[in-house]
């Protein structure tokens, strides 16, 4: 059944949180000073228009994506994360759900808590809050 040629569309509650994880961590891993890094992230975000596993979600994302010159935003993690924050907010509003973050700052704090290792849990490495978020 899953091997037939017809597409299998899935409800967002099944795949959504996993996509957000990949989107957010991809942006955090991007080097905004390196053009190839920005270009790959741009292509990744562009490709979501055609690969989201929900046709309605694809259509909504296409409309949202096409309103912005994504390449200009990719020179700043703050700007691209603000774009993601507004996308998430728009989705929740469209679905009649309360958005869990009252401000962009609360969203950033959540990202830091979820994805940035605490110093006591990590040996000295190139990953640090200062390096990753002071450039926002």
Residue ranges and their predicted role:
Residues 1-136:
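Terminal, compositionally biased segments used for targeting/anchoring and flexible tails
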């Amino acid at each position: 059944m899953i091997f037939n040629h017809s597409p299998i569309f899935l409800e967002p509650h099944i795949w959504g949180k996993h996509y957000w994880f990949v989107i957010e961590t991809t942006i955090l891993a991007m080097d905004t000073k390196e053009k190839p890094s920005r270009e790959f992230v741009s292509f990744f975000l562009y490709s979501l228009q055609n690969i989201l596993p929900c046709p309605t979600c694809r259509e909504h994302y296409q409309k949202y994506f096409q309103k912005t010159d994504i390449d200009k935003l990719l020179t700043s993690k703050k700007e691209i994360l603000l774009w993601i924050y507004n996308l998430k907010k728009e989705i929740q509003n469209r679905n009649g759900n309360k958005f869990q973050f009252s401000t962009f700052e609360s969203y950033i704090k959540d990202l830091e808590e979820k994805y940035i290792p605490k110093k006591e849990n990590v040996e000295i490495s190139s990953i640090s809050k200062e390096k990753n978020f002071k450039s926002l």
